[in-house]
Amino acid sequence: MLQWLHSCWPFGKYRRQKYVPLDTSSSCPDRWKIEIEIAQPPGVFVGDILQNSDSDASLRQAYLLAVQLNNITDYLKRFDEASVPESCKSVVQTQITKLKSVRNIIWNTMLSMAVGGVTIDDAALKTLLDKRAGESIALIEMEKLATAIVMDDSKAWAKEINNIILSAEHEKQILVNSEVPLIECETLAAEKTTTPAVSI
C-alpha cells in the first residue's frame, strides 16, 4: 500500500535528511586550503606545509600570505587586461613593478615554508603583510584608474588628466622663467655698485 502511495505523492517520497555541519575541528579549514592552493607557486601544495613540524603556525601564516598574494594577482590580471592610455602607462607600470616584487617575496616565503619547514616571526609576517601600506593611496588611485579604463571607452578622462599635467608643467616653467631675469638683474646691479679697486 505504501509503495503504491509513493508513486502518487506529487513531490516524491519524503525523506528526512539530517543536517551535517562543516567540520571545524580540522587544522586546515576548506577556505584556507582553497586560498593557499590558488596562491602557491607551481609544484607546491598544502600538504607540503602540513608536513612542517609547527604545522598550525605555518598554515596560518601561509593562509594570510595567500590572501595577500591573491589580491595582488587580481590587481595584476586586471591591469594586464585593461588598455592603459599612453599618458598613464608610466604610473601604472611603476605600481605593477612594485606589486610583482611583493609577489615574488611572498612566493619565496611560501617555498621556504613548504620545502625548508620554516616559520617566520609574527613581527616579520606583519611587516610583509603591511608591505603595501605605504602604497595604499597609490593602490586606491590604481583602483579608480582600472575602473575608469574598463568603463570609459572614449578615454576622455585620460585626456583631461594629461591636460592637467601639461598645464601644471607649463605654469611651473613660466614661474621658473620669470625668476631667472630677476636673479640676473640683481647680480648686474650688485656688480655695478661695487667700487673698483684703486691702484696707488
Curated annotation (Swiss-Prot):
Q: What is this protein called?
A: Gene 55 protein
Q: Which UniProt keyword terms apply here?
A: Host cytoplasm, Host Golgi apparatus, Lipoprotein, Palmitate, Phosphoprotein, Virion, Virion tegument
Q: Where mainly located? A: virion
InterPro entries, alphabetically?
A: Herpes_U44
The record's subcellular location field reads: Virion tegument; Host cytoplasm; Host Golgi apparatus
What are the annotated GO cellular component locations? Answer: host cell Golgi apparatus; viral tegument
Which organism does this record belong to? Saimiriine herpesvirus 2 (strain 11)
- Say where the lipid (S-palmitoyl cysteine) is covalently attached: 8
Q: Name the family the entry cites.
A: Belongs to the herpesviridae UL51 family.
Supply the source organism's classification.
Viruses, Duplodnaviria, Heunggongvirae, Peploviricota, Herviviricetes
Q: What does this protein do?
A: Plays several roles during the time course of infection, including egress of virus particles from the perinuclear space and secondary envelopment of cytoplasmic capsids that bud into specific trans-Golgi network (TGN)-derived membranes.
How would you summarize the oligomeric state and partners of this protein?
Oligomerizes. Interacts with ORF42; this interaction mediates ORF42 incorporation to virions.
Q: How is it modified after translation?
A: Phosphorylated.
